[in-house]
């Protein structure tokens, strides 16, 4: 980082803040996705609500450009597929 340029110092500070915020959002998405999947595998009734919460967080991250829109769609699709598979296994 260039120590002589105030604007470069400020941009660096801002990038560190954004990185922390983005990492926290991605971590929350992973946590809620895992909780939804575990709930579906365990046959919990609130698995659908957890899935909706995870998908909402994914959409918000994509809206704020933390995630690319295609990456968000892929995560939602894979989560739904895994949860549906777990629910089908519970019923069988």
Swiss-Prot record:
Highest taxon in the source lineage: Bacteria
Gene Ontology biological-process entries: translation
Cellular compartments per GO CC: small ribosomal subunit
Keywords on record: Ribonucleoprotein, Ribosomal protein, RNA-binding, rRNA-binding
Keyword Ribosomal protein: yes
Record's compositionally biased regions (Low complexity): 80-92
An example molecular function term from Gene Ontology annotations: small ribosomal subunit rRNA binding
Function field: Binds directly to 16S ribosomal RNA.
Xref: NCBIfam families: S20
Full protein name: Small ribosomal subunit protein bS20
Gene that encodes the chain: rpsT
